[in-house]
Amino acid sequence: MKKLTIAWLSAGVSSFIAAYLIRDEIDEFYYIDIDDQHPDSMRFIKDCESALGRPIKILKSNYGSVENAILAQGCIRIAKTGFAPCTAYLKRRVRKEQFELLHQNDEITYVWGFDSTKHEQNRADRIVEAMPQYNHRFPLIEQGLTKQDAHAVLRRLNIRRPAMYDLGYQNNNCV
């Protein structure tokens, strides 16, 4: 059995900064590419790779896009909760099929980019409850950092944030 610490980058600032803060403790970095991400997301991932000085492995769902996942699975976005079931098919399923099955006998620690706000702390608690078979690290929460703090660290690293933020979005999710 191997012990692995894995960071899943979302192409968002918070997930990158969380990984960056404990980069020397992380064995592998991953990004799951989705066709519907803004084209600038890949530039950001490459900039993150340069800052980390380590490769970021890129995985991709066979569905490719949100539309394909919706058509194949008949899922829709639930506006009230903000939950997009397509995320389950484009990210979670990829993680399970392309990573977790290969490492099912290993001790895995996942690094997450949730910040220190109460809402994000609640999300972290739900992750721990939903995935008890893994260990979890939340560097932004551990260091009391907010999303704004993460953006400030990114500026100090002289990395341009993903274009979706400059278009007024709070996160760098699908377009």
Residue map of PLM features:
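Nucleotide-activated chemistry modules centered on ATP-dependent adenylation/adenylyltransferase
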Residues: 1-175
